């Protein structure tokens, strides 16, 4: 099963052989966010929302026929887990205006069997169901840097914390061993990076399975019989896959993958193949399989690239520069093709969201488009606070240190000015979500070094953002940004808010927003647009009525890209498209 978009919205398709034709299975009016196969069956579940509101509903479906909705309208449903035999499904549910989460369990073939089995305040999500259907493994999220693992006994309703003495640890991707006596998870215990561990349920003691790694384990999978282990390492942004036999403890032949980024992987039921998705800088996400004996690496799909010419795609260059305090910051640089070595190109600094995110060398249609169509050099920095470089680096922008990441962009502007093929007088900043906040903040600090800014659904005031973001995510965001109810943090927010410094924004601004955004509400964009316009600064504002936090529908994305192109051409003083020579 693959998710792809041929029409206006992403839907689920089926591919039965490498290079085979895709058969569409879902026909929803809204984009389908993703699908998960139900073990041991020819069925799957998928999730979708309405207009980008992120109140996700879960549907069970076969390869033909109408899907069955398993969830109640008006609720947010996530974190789907199955028992090994596929006869039980679990997920967590949140409701509007409440920070309470509930875990639901039932038979995926019978919506009437689903019932609530546990609830508490704060974010929780199932990870796995035991083979005997007696227990649910779930994670309680404290923040993006801390979580706890629990086993829920379905008969008694009692919970048991796993490794209660571990301290402040982030656990991710947890799953039960087949005998339920241990748990596999990615853990930050006693490490700056996420390591793969096996935790004994009774004692809480863990065994580190990847003790020597200096990078994060990003995901892993284990065969149904708990014999084969495959895990992926985020090595300076690139995914590297390792496969091991857990019984003999020996490493198997390792797949030589194209340099890119992997998100998910899974062993086939007969354990002969490992399936995974892979996205590279010059190819959109595709599905591959690798024979565990090391014989063959097979590409199943070849995704289309729209109107982009594969021959003209840019391979990003990894660069590093020093920031104001000596901290090294990395960035990916996409340079346009066919540009003379001494020609100074305009620059777009594209700052990722999160802030606990990372720009990686996966398919980036925006960077490729701006390099190919605008002839711009696109720089994507991983400022402090980014993940992928250890917990210490990720914590460098917390709370009162928020603007240190903005200073990293000041250092990047210095680096740009020192490059012989970059035009320091034609630099724009671009970002979405938290990157939108960064775009606004950079515009208040470095307006004299920019020609303008593009920001999409960015935070303009942390205090109003925390007040108005959906209740189910508010405490998690407070753990990252700080608590607006604390007078000390309230003073920090007042000082650093782009809205409070809007008079310093003196260059043209393009703002885009989804009307149904539950994360960064439309009010954040409304207020900053009003503030900039009140000062007489040119401000373009585009609101999509049927989108949320991100734009998923093709007509809306086509319009977004066209507006951005017109706006940036104006900033860069490009009256017509860049020619083959790279000159106007």
PLM region spans:
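Conserved beta-propeller blade repeats
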Residues: 1-3, 29-47, 58, 74-95, ...
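Beta-propeller blade-edge and WD-like acidic-aromatic loop motif
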Residues: 4-24, 43, 49-69, 88, ...
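Hydrophobic/aromatic anchor residues within beta-strands of the central parallel beta-sheet
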Residues: 12, 149, 196, 331, ...
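Short, solvent-exposed loop/turn and secondary-structure capping segments
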Residues: 55-57, 102, 148, 195, ...
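Cap/lid segment of the alpha/beta-hydrolase catalytic domain
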Residues: 138, 294-296, 301-434, 438, ...
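Flexible loop/turn segments at secondary-structure boundaries
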Residues: 146, 169, 191-194, 216-217, ...
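Extracellular/periplasmic ectodomains of large secreted or surface enzymes and adhesion receptors
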Residues: 180, 198-212, 219-232, 242-255, ...
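Active-site-proximal cap/loop segments of hydrolase catalytic domains
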Residues: 380-584
